[in-house]
């Protein structure tokens, strides 16, 4: 971390004694620069190319290779239009640094840490380099603890680990964005924490939609930006591969400051982790490296590891990361998702079938998994309840074909009871969200883990068999379901 004396200008160290080179070759987003003997920049140093007087050129590059003969190869973080051989290159003497701290909340940044939301400059007195080592072993918090989200289906069936990494699998229109926003909202209210969203290879439209929805739901406070609970960092699809490869590190650097200096629990979203690998593959090819399996970069595991190992819990705070994972051609053995899976502690799978039924969040209770769901970690009561919920849901799934062909009446008494309870469980796994209040008209609910376990135990025990299944739909805790059942009964009597 660096404390800069002034708030002006981009994140570049003082250039009184400029180390100057010149461009000798440009191949798309990659350029070679020649420096004087003995003045070679280090790997990962930021280089700046400025145009002559009157030219609107200001391109930042990152040194990737030392070629010998005083030449370096660098990857540009923005378009290289207008660059020519012979142009002057300034070695900043340090890696790319970005603004960190409270000034970043409520704002949108690019990979260089420059605001792109037309809301004026950002305080850059405190900056931090995007390249740094992972926390040392002695700094790590090895205690296994659950990260309570207040979302019933997540906390019960696939609990998140504090400082863990979660893979979020879901297609378009199944509620991924709303789930992300609810998690941001809940961590702000329940844990007093902040969130950082890294859009890696994000569609510009999706990024814009997310920003607008965050403003509408109050996650970003337009009237008082400082009270916002999220910082956004975007490297869109149209950006050069260098920007898409490094934007994840920019977001992570901002999150690390909140963890290490402010000692907060931070939520880090990366959408999409596959595009981080894809950008690395493009850069690797441009640098002339021999490709590895399926055309990926030979450094795939190293690049993924250097990003993922920085996402962890320390004694000061934690970074819990939720990463959207795209699986190419649904092939889980593809090197990109396979390398990602090795780092994940939990998977949250969103189901289009549940979304079609109107059950939100549309988290699939059978496909979602977590390494935390062990009796030694969550306790016997939680573990047993979760297993019974899964067994009941699994049995219902097996019986659906029979029900479709022969109907419910052909089932045994025991199976009919299982189906009735499974349908109540399915509906009770739904929940009204705070960020969706504007659309649903129902006030959002945060449900504690103890309340969640109690609710499902009551359904499984058969104590609530007499209640109609619609009483369990879109409620918070089980007491609300009981109250809703009484209201439905009163309404039915009035109708008669």
Swiss-Prot record:
Q: Which UniProt keywords apply?
A: ATP synthesis, ATP-binding, CF(1), Chloroplast, Hydrogen ion transport, Ion transport, Membrane, Nucleotide-binding, Plastid, Thylakoid, Translocase, Transport
Q: Report the EC number(s), separated by commas if there are several.
A: 7.1.2.2
| Domain of life per record | Eukaryota
Q: Name one cellular component (GO) term.
A: proton-transporting ATP synthase complex
**Which InterPro entries does this UniProt record tie to the protein?**
AAA+_ATPase (IPR003593), ATP-synt_VA_C (IPR055190), ATP_synth_F1_bsu (IPR005722), ATPase_a/bsu_AS (IPR020003), ATPase_alpha/beta_chains (IPR050053), ATPase_F1/V1/A1_a/bsu_N (IPR004100), ATPase_F1/V1/A1_a/bsu_N_sf (IPR036121), ATPase_F1/V1/A1_a/bsu_nucl-bd (IPR000194)
Alphabetized PROSITE patterns for the sequence: ATPASE_ALPHA_BETA
Kindly give the membrane topology term recorded for this protein: Peripheral membrane protein
What the entry lists under CDD domains is as follows:
ATP-synt_F1_beta_C, ATP-synt_F1_beta_N, F1-ATPase_beta_CD
Q: Please give the family membership noted in the entry.
A: Belongs to the ATPase alpha/beta chains family.
* Described purpose of this protein according to its UniProt entry: Produces ATP from ADP in the presence of a proton gradient across the membrane. The catalytic sites are hosted primarily by the beta subunits.
- Its name, as the record gives it, is ATP synthase subunit beta, chloroplastic
Q: Which gene encodes it?
A: atpB
């Amino acid at each position: 971390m660096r404390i800069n004396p002034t708030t002006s200008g981009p994140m570049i160290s003082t250039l009184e004694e400029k180390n100057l080179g010149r461009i000798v070759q440009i191949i798309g987003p990659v350029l070679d620069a020649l420096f004087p003997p003995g003045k070679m920049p280090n790997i990962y140093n930021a280089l700046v190319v400025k145009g002559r007087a009157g030219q609107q050129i200001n391109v930042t590059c990152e040194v990737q290779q030392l070629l010998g003969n005083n030449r370096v190869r660098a990857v540009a973080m923005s378009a290289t239009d207008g660059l020519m051989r012979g142009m002057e290159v300034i070695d900043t003497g340090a890696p790319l640094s970005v603004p960190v701290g409270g000034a970043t909340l409520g704002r949108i940044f690019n990979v260089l840490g420059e605001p792109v939301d037309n809301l004026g400059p950002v305080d850059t007195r405190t900056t931090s380099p995007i390249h740094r080592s992972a926390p040392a072993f002695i700094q790590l918090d090895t205690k296994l603890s659950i990260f309570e989200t207040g979302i019933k289906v997540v906390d019960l069936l696939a609990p998140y680990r504090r400082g863990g990494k979660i893979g979020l699998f879901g297609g378009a229109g199944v509620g991924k964005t709303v789930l992300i926003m609810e998690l941001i909202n809940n961590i702000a209210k329940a844990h007093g924490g902040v969130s950082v969203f890294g859009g890696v290879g994000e569609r510009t439209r999706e990024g814009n939609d997310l920003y607008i929805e965050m403003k509408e739901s109050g996650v970003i406070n337009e009237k008082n930006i400082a009270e916002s609970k999220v910082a956004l960092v975007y490297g869109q699809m149209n950006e050069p591969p260098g920007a898409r490869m490094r934007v994840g590190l920019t977001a992570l650097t901002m999150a690390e400051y909140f963890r290490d200096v402010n000692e907060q629990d931070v939520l880090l979203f990366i959408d999409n982790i596959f595009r981080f690998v894809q950008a690395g593959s493009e850069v690797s090819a441009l640098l002339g490296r021999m490709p590895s399996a399926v055309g990926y970069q030979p450094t795939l595991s190293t690049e993924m590891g250097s990003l993922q190992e920085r996402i962890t819990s320390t004694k000061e705070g934690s970074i819990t990361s939720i990463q959207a994972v795209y699986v190419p051609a649904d092939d889980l053995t593809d090197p990109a998702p396979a390398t990602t899976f090795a780092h994940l502690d939990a998977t949250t799978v969103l189901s289009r079938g549940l979304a079609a039924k109107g059950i939100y969040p549309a988290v699939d209770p059978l496909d979602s998994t977590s390494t935390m769901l062990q009796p030694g970690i969550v306790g016997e009561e939680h573990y047993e309840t979760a297993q019974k919920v899964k067994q009941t849901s699994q049995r219902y799934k097996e019986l659906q074909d029979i029900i479709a062909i022969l109907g419910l009446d052909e089932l045994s008494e025991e199976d009919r009871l299982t189906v009735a309870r499974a349908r109540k469980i399915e509906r009770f796994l739904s929940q009204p969200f705070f960020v969706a209040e504007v659309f649903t008209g129902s006030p959002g609910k945060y449900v504690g883990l103890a309340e969640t376990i109690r609710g499902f135990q009551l359904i499984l025990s058969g104590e609530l068999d007499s209640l109609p299944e619609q009483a369990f739909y879109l409620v918070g805790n089980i007491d609300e379901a009981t109250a809703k059942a009484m209201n439905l009964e009163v309404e039915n009597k009035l109708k008669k």
